[in-house]
Structure formats: C-alpha cells, structure tokens
Amino acid sequence: MGHRWAAFVSAKVNGETIPLGPTHWARGLQAPVAFPYQRPTEASAMGGGVWQDNTDGTYTQLDDDYYVPATGWSYLDLYLMGLAAPAEVPDFFILRSLVPAGRDANGHPIFKADRMKVTIQDVIAAEGPRMPDVEHSQKQFNTGIVVVVEHGNKPSKELIERANGIRERWIDYWATTTGHRSSMTVNPK
C-alpha cells in the first residue's frame, strides 16, 4: 500500500540531489516507524532501517526493512501519505558507503559508513511540497479482499472466516500504524 506514495523520493542536500531509494528506502536510510505495530523498534514497511550511531564512525542496525513481522510507517512515509505535516517529520539521515564491521552482542550488524543529515525541507527542495497537504489529503481508504476458488466451486465457510480475519487485522493494522490519523474499510463496491 505504501507504494501509492513512496519511495521514489529524493532530497536536495547542499545542492546535491540524493536518491533516498528506488522502490523501497535505501538500506542506510534512518526510517524508524512513528507508531509501531508489534515491536518497540521497527523500521518502515517501505524500507530503510533503525540505526544507532556508535559515535565512532560505525552504526548498528537495530531493525531492518523486512516485513515479517509486519511493521508500520516512518514520519517521512506519513508525510508523503498526507498524514503528517512537514513540522512533524524529525531530521533523519542516510548512511552511504556501508561497509560491514561486525556484529554487536545481540547479533545486530555493525557498519562503517558516511552519514549525511537529511531534513524534510531537503525532501521538499527536491520534490516540492506534498499536494494536497495534510489538512486536505484523503484520510479514509477502502480496499478489497478477493477470495479465489476453482471454477464452479463456492468458498467454504472456513475460507470466508479466514478472509474476514484478514480484513479485521488489516483494518486494525492501518489504524495503528497511521496513529489513527487515517481509517481503512474493506467494503465491496
């Protein structure tokens, strides 16, 4: 769902246009979620990571961009979705020239890297302001769930119950990970 808004985004930092990722955020992008879904530390569902600066030129990756278990959205994601104002997006950074440097005591990977600070104003300088802005953007969404069975067969009661379970979890996931700034329905039209 996040591909509707992200991640083909760049930032203009000191006159240089920096891609923040292709279809997902670059691995070195600091992208912690604003409203975690399952764990206290989660990287954005759109990619990037949660990075700890070790203050010695190395960075520990506390969470990565894998989707299992499900994760939420960073403030940058929420801004691009029209669910956060620019003032809500904290400064972040992108790590470039990542070189593996070991693992910490918990097994998290450590990298040497070059850190570049990025602000939402840098993103706006490259992409322009989000239109419509947070005050005028869409907040209610509707998605469909399709149940497929072999030709001539009807879906079983169990299959319908599973689809309804997915629907309920999807609606809860969306509300939680957007900080209840947006709602999702699953109503066939």
Description of each model-found segment:
Residues M1-G15:
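Active-site recognition of the HExxH zinc-binding catalytic motif
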